Amino acid sequence: MAADILAGGPSEAAGLPSLLDNLRRPRADIAGLALDRPRTMGIVNVTPDSFADGGRYHARDAAIAHALQLEAEGADILDIGGESTRPGADPVDAEEEWRRVGPVIEALAPRTRARLSIDTRKAEVMRRAAQAGVHLINDVSALRHDPASLETAARTGLPVVLMHAQGDPRSMQDKPHYDDVVLDICDWLGSRIEACEAAGIPRSRLIVDPGIGFGKTLAHNLGLLGCLSLFHGLGCAVLIGASRKSFIGRLTGTADADDRLPGSLAAALIGAAQGVQVLRVHDVAATRQALAVWEGAWRAQASP
C-alpha cells in the first residue's frame, strides 16, 4: 500500500484518504502517557549477553537498582528484558526468561511511577508479566515468534510494540535484502497491524518500530533514520531503538558500544525531529538533556 501510494500505483486513489486520515488522527495515550512530547524508554537488560550491557544487571538487585536509577534520570517507561536479541544471540526458554525478569518486575511494580514494559517474544512471559503489573508489551518479532502471542496480547488489553526484524537473531544479519527498505518495512508493519486488529487489538493500542539494527545493513539503517516520518502514515505511535547500536560504530569507527553516546543522541534527535513518540535508550539522562535543548529551540521558533 505505501509503495503504491508513493509511486502512484493502482491502489493510490483508494489508499490516499486512509493515509491522510492516519496522519491526521491524534495518537491515543500509551499506558496513560500522553504523546505530546517524545517519551524515553529506559533499557533494563536482565541478561548475561546483551550487546551493550550484558551481564552488568543480570542479578536481580543490580537490575532493580539500575531501573530505579533510570527512573530517577527521567525515564517514562522501563523496558525489562530477559532474552538477548542481539545478532547471533541464542534463544532461552520461557521459564528461564521469566526466572530472570519476574522478580525484577514484581519488585518494581509497587515501587516505581514509571510504566513497565516487558521485552519478550513469548506468550507465556507476556501473560505472567501482565499479571505482575507491566503496562506494555514490546515484541521484537511483532507477535510472530510465538503462535499464541496474538491471542495472549489481545487478552491482556495492554499496548503492544510491533517491531520489524528480517529473520531471527541468529540469522538476521545474513545478507539482509530489501527492494526499498522504507516502503518494504512500512508495508510489512501494515500487515502486522491488520493481523492484530483481526485478533482484537485495536490500532490505538499499537506502536510501530522499524527495527533499526535488526536485519539491516548500515545503508538500510541510515535510510530508515532519514524517512521515519513515513511510518506515521500507519496510524500508530512510532518508537525507535538506535541506542549504542553497531551501525553507529560502523559509521564512526567506534568499536566499544559504551563510546557511542554521541551517535545515539544524534539518532534520538533525528527521530524527535520527525515526530517519533518513544525513544528506547540506554542513556536516559543524556537523552533527556538533548531533548530539552531541542524542545526549547522548537518552542522558541514556534512562539510569536
Where are these regions (language model features)?
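Glycine/alanine-rich phosphate-binding loops at beta-alpha junctions
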Residues: 23-30, 59-61, 71, 78-79
